[in-house]
């Protein structure tokens, strides 16, 4: 342990902010090789026997981050994994290891160490609660291991300085060697899960209080008033067509022969059906197919026969309708009965060859 406070020999305004390369070359490598370090500012502390919030009190120097030399124990007697369990929780590795390299003077970079990031969790795995305490663990690369250096000097095989050369788990982990640890608390990190839930709940309440209250009833009357209008537009029945049509003209039209019927009659009847004052937006122009009168080229016996058939079919259909529904009844009764067959006139018009579709 350090018997003398190193801060007493430091000049005013001194801050200890070493780089990763400086920590490896000037502190960790000398500690592992038992060489004197430049300044006794890093204490020897087994960080796995304490909680991270208790470590700042054990550091001889530091304000927002603290440095320690710490040993590592094996998780299993014959294993190569370190034991990350601490006093009231455990350290968990996060991310990938970072290689620390420096130029060797020959235009190449030599790997001198490895940096690993860990996060402290309260409790036991795997149900630990994440905290804001972070640790950066530095360890020497294989090329700087004292065991490798002594083996090379004693006549052993030459050691490749590349970090990827790993011939033994003992040298790759070297759990019996020292590691350098930097401990700090992340200031703007996410809180633990109970605190996060509490903060999130409070923020939601504050946002709901600041939002203007909108009464849903302000929109409902408009929707309710629009529904009858939509129903009126979409509930046009055959009885409405009869209300818009002269019944006397319809009876005469059915009893007349096709020869005496002119194009003006058709246009008059269709014009009444598509009266915009009654149905609006030319409802029947959209629902009924457009009709055209027979062309002037249609002539001869075949056309006359088709007209006679049309007249007979129309008269028979009208007689059946007259027998079933009497004109002696009121207009309302006729409307009710005709609603049972809303497509009667449409079927007669489509079955007839006298009236054809356009398009």
Curated annotation (Swiss-Prot):
GO terms for cellular component: nucleus. Residues 147-166, 200-226 are annotated as: Disordered. It is found in: Nucleus. Keywords: DNA-binding, Nucleus, Transcription, Transcription regulation. Residues 10-186 form the NAC domain. Residues 112-192 bind DNA. One of its GO terms (molecular function) is DNA-binding transcription factor activity. GO terms for biological process: embryo development ending in seed dormancy; positive regulation of ethylene biosynthetic process; response to flooding. In rosette plants, root flooding (waterlogging) triggers rapid upward (hyponastic) leaf movement representing an important architectural stress response that critically determines plant performance in natural habitats. Plants silencing NAC047 produce abnormally shaped seeds. Transcription factor that binds to the promoter of ACO5, an ACC oxidase involved in ethylene biosynthesis. Mediates waterlogging-induced hyponastic leaf movement, and cell expansion in abaxial cells of the basal petiole region, by directly regulating the expression of ACO5. Required for normal seed development and morphology. This is NAC transcription factor 47. The lineage of its organism: Eukaryota, Viridiplantae, Streptophyta, Embryophyta, Tracheophyta. The gene is NAC047.
